[in-house]
Amino acid sequence: KSGTRDSLRQIISTWRDYLSMADKLGINTNDEIVYRVKLLRQRHDELVEQLRKRERDMEAAATARKYRKIAGICRSIKPKYEYTGEVYSIVVPSGVRDIMREGDALSHCVGKSDRYWERIEQQEAYILFLRKTAEIDKPYYTLEVEPNGTIRQKRTYFDRQNDDLKDAEKFLKEWQKVVSERLTESDREKAEKSKVLRLQEFEQLRQDDIRIHTGDLAGQRLVDVLVSDLMETAA
């Protein structure tokens, strides 16, 4: 009987939670088809996802208002940095929401930190997507790239790098060569400033002895991880 009561309490709690979320989403909770819901757990979980998406959309809109240049920058760099190979491709996001979706899909920090938005807005570094050409819409690796094609970071699920990234390195070097041929003098000037800022940041991280606290890299110095990740262009 105790187990039955606990089960009933859980069902009632889930139902109340479901109705609360439905109300927040503007769904008429007085409608019988709503309050006498079938497949309660499934519908509850669907509303959780809808509410999460709406909150992220609102957050993306607020971020886009704060960093108004990002959408235009993404449009302007698209012809220069996008590249399609037989196995891999580089995709330029359309703006803030694309980048946030990427970060959510891969469960890493891109899209959750102002420093990435600031770097894009100042054209110090861009966020690009490494994708498999056959699965062009599926998040694979996220890249942070300086204006000359130097790759600062390459991260997949949970900020990791897996062995499969080694297979993509030849393509990334090929992409860097292609990009170097597309660069303007303005791009090269931006890249020089970007390099100076990167080196200054690395030196500050060394002095502060900043360590990673979570994940597979916990305990390592952040600067050592970033230096190891760096893939400078040969151009």
Give the predicted meaning of each segment.
Residues 1-235:
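Glycine-focused motif/segment detector
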